[in-house]
Amino acid sequence: MKTQGAIIRQVPGRYETAELELDEAGPGELTVKMVASGLCHTDDHVATGDMEYGIYPVCGGHEGAGVVVQVGEAVRGWSEGDHVVFSFLPACGKCRWCARGMQNLCDRGAGLMNGSRLDDPTSFRMRLDGQPVGQMFGISTFSQYTTVDVDNAVKVPVDAPLESLCLLGCGVGTGWGSAVNLADIYPGDTVIVMGVGGIGINAVQGAVHSGAGQVIAVDPVAFKREKAMEFGATHVVENIEEGAELARTFTNGQGADATIVTVGVTTPEHVSQAFSSIRKAGTVVVTGVGDITRTDLSLSIGELTVFQKRLQGSLFGASNPTADIPWLVDLYTRGQLKLDELITHRYTLDQVAQGYEDMHAGKNIRGIVVYDA
């Protein structure tokens, strides 16, 4: 079938639309008509080369929601017309990690950077002029239609707005989970969030949900600091030095109980700054993505050992998508999670590049692509 998609032809590159050939749902797959897609910073990393993909061209987008139009062979529990939110990480429910409640580390995610079907690096669902096109994390939500593995799909109620739910499969789950699942926050704690874009703003929400008494949002962009207050931050500052000093004033000089690093392009320097901001036995959660080839992280081994500080990586906020996405939908419908307020601009498919320009200009918390009904 034919579909319009936003692709990156090579790196560094800029998103452009093209007519693509898309496979219909095969065994274990769903074909979905897209309703909305979030503009996640990770898709920009693939365009800039900060995160080089396995194949180019690649059709971007991994955070989205839509309506099932075709159900492949051997797929149980799904029907045409079902509403779906994609998890950018698959969950097979069978591997060691899924069995231990760590679906975000599912073994089927090992091939995500190939752009191919999950279990066959030579098999692609999209083509341009007869040549294979990679799917971003096997999903490609920057397309009018997409075909995905059922392990990337989570069914949601048909009466919940997909425009808002589209953000759950990456940005919201990642930020929220970084606070709720990994930061070890107790009621009354002091928490710093470094960078309050589409992920960090949800770490703010998660810290508030966990009972943090002081939530310090750090961002150089005034617009984002203002938005952070709307999402529950108690204090906002421009840089981590100010944030760390403020945390010490709240804790009799001890430092933050947890610092969550959600900077758009995270560097080892950001992690070192966060490490210096926490108290004894405090936690740094590293969620942001940067140059994955860098290995020059500088930390005090003495502080790590003697002060029992903890450095915690975060993939999708340690979320279990089959359980956590429905939970987040429920929180949203009960007014306990802000989603509508995250959306700062709406774009059409041919405006994806503009959306990322706006993101870099500090105009967006989360932009979304909205498709025709």
How would you label these PLM feature ranges?
Residues 1, 241-242, 272-276, 318-373:
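C-terminal hydrophobic helical "lid"/dimerization subdomain
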Residues 23-37, 50-99, 104, 112, ...:
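Glycine-rich beta-strand-centered segment in the early N-terminal region that forms part
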Residues 88-151:
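Cysteine-cluster motifs in flexible loop/terminal segments that predominantly coordinate metals
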Residues 144-145, 151-153, 157-245:
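Mid-domain Rossmann-like dinucleotide-binding core that forms the NAD(H)/NADP(H) cofactor-binding site
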Residues 243-253:
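Short amphipathic alpha-helix with an adjacent loop that forms part of the alpha/beta core around
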Residues 254-260:
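Short SAM/SAH-binding signature in class I
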Residues 264-336, 371-373:
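Glycine-rich phosphate-binding loop and adjacent beta-alpha segment
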